[in-house]
């Protein structure tokens, strides 16, 4: 976007230098990853320390959709109201701000529902809601009544924010000794989602942007339904004296 072929804010030499730095950084990270994890490849991992990385990957993808949607939508929602419905900027800002406030209720509710009804079923429900609500928002045009648009966007916000809570309700249950690492990586993918969705918005129309969110949520829903496993039984923790404690996850 900033190169001579885009906004022309950077020279071609600068662009190539940035590409080179990114490539070198990538190679260094690959080498560091191998150094840290080589022992896992060379030696068998104790049974108590094993976990399925597929579960981590699905939660990363899920949080990319839920929190990424929050970041992207709250960044453009006020301008959407101004451009589409000629709402004054103060009102548009207040409406967009109310979208963010939903987080205070919806995210804890997602965690609460996960504890009460199960992690996987809650994730399935909220992702159905995300896909459906943003598919509806993608159909909005100037003939729609503004309250209906606000209602549709609010439902999308409720489901996406509840989804963030539901994702983190499951993160500590993958492998207790790695909870911090798994939580950190999952959280990082939320920012990845925000950048990815806003990049899409920079290249396409607003309806296509909302439909992209809906389609990504639908694909993630399939992965959750087919491959995510509901935590059952017990997780283990090795105490300082070397004994193993079983912790019920249900």
Question: Model features per residue range: what roles?
Answer:
Residues 1-14, 54-100:
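Extracytoplasmic gate region of multi-pass secondary transporters
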Residues 161-175:
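Intracellular juxtamembrane helix-capping segments at the cytosolic ends
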Residues 100-108, 191, 195:
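Residue-level signature of mid-helix packing/kink "hotspots" within the transmembrane helices
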Residues 176-205:
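A late C-terminal transmembrane helix in Major Facilitator Superfamily
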Residues 12-28, 209-227:
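Symmetry-related core transmembrane helices of the 12-TM Major Facilitator Superfamily/SLC fold
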Residues 128-143:
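C-terminal ends and interior cores of transmembrane alpha-helices
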Residues 115-128:
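Cytoplasmic membrane-interface "Motif A"-like loop-to-helix N-cap segments
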Residues 106-118:
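Helix-to-loop junctions at the C-terminal end of transmembrane segments
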